[in-house]
Amino acid sequence: MSKDKDIKVTPGTCELVEQILALLSRYLSSYIHVLNKFISHLRRVATLRFERTTLIKFVKKLRFYNDCVLSYNASEFINEGKNELDPEADSFDKVILPIASMFVKCVETFDLLNYYLTQSLQKEILSKTLNEDLTLTAESILAIDDTYNHFVKFSQWMIESLRIGSNLLDLEVVQFAIKCADEDGTNIGETDNIFLQEILPVNSEEEFQTLSAAWHSILDGKLSALDEEFDVVATKWHDKFGKLKN
C-alpha cells in the first residue's frame, strides 16, 4: 500500500481484524466438529483405518490453526497515545500481513482436505464398504466447494485491496485460473469465474471497513449453509451407522 494512503492501526481496525479472524475460526471449527464425528464412526470400519488416520492428521492441523487464530491479538499493535493520523502509528499492513498469511495457509490446507474428503475418500468408502452409509451428500459437497471458493476470493481481496501482494501470498487455485484464462484468451471482464473477477484497491479505513462488512455478511451466509449441510450429513451417518452397537 502506498504511504500516502496508508491505513493505520486503530481500535476500529483491530475490531475489524477480530471479526475477520472470527470467520476463519468458525470455518475451521465447522470442519473440526464434523470430522470428529466422522472419525468416530470410522472406528467401526476396519477397512477404512488408514483413511481414518489421515483424517485425524487433518483435524490436528486444523485445531492447531484454530488455536493460532484465537490467540492472535491485534490490539497489541496499537501505540498508546497515538492516533491514525500520527506518522509514527503502525501501519495496518503490520497487522493484516500475518492474517493474510494465515488465511492463505488455511485455504491451501482446505484445498487438499476438500479434494481428499469429497473425491478420493468417497471412492474408497464406496469400494471398501459397498454402500453409501458413510458418504457425503451431493448438497454437502456443493456447500463445501462454494464456501471454499468464497474464502479463497476473500483472501485474494484482502491481499490485493490493500496492495500487500507477494508471490509468497499467491493462492494456487487463483494462479491456475489466471494461467488457464491467459492460455484460452478468456476475456476476464466477461467471465463468471469468481477467481478472475477484478479487485480494486481501497484508499481508506472506512472503505475497507465497508467492504469487509459486505464480505462478512457473504461469508457468514456461506458458513451457515455449510453448517446446515454438515448437520444433515452427520445425522445421516448417525441414523445409518451411529446406532449400531460396538
UniProtKB/Swiss-Prot annotation:
Changing residue 36 to S: Prevents association with ASH1 and IST2 mRNAs and leads to their mislocalization. InterPro entries: RNA-bd_She2, She2_dom_sf. Belongs to the SHE2 family. RNA-binding protein that binds specific mRNAs including the ASH1 mRNA, coding for a repressor of the HO endonuclease. Part of the mRNA localization machinery that restricts accumulation of certain proteins to the bud and in the daughter cell. Recruits the MYO4-SHE3 complex to the ASH1 mRNA. Also recruits LOC1 and PUF6 to ASH1 mRNA, which are required for translational repression of this mRNA. Changing residue 130 to Y: Prevents tetramerization. It is found in: Cytoplasm; Nucleus. Keywords: Cytoplasm, mRNA transport, Nucleus, RNA-binding, Transport. The gene is SHE2. GO terms for molecular function: lipid binding; mRNA binding; sequence-specific mRNA binding. One of its GO terms (cellular component) is nucleus. It comes from the Eukaryota. This is SWI5-dependent HO expression protein 2. It comes from Saccharomyces cerevisiae (strain ATCC 204508 / S288c). GO terms for biological process: intracellular mRNA localization; mating type switching; mRNA transport. SUPFAM superfamilies: RNA-binding protein She2p (SSF116942). A motif (Nuclear localization signal) lies at residues 15-23. Present with 4070 molecules/cell in log phase SD medium. Homodimer and homotetramer. Interacts with LOC1, MYO4, PUF6, SHE3 and with RNA pol II subunits RPO21, SPT4 and SPT5.
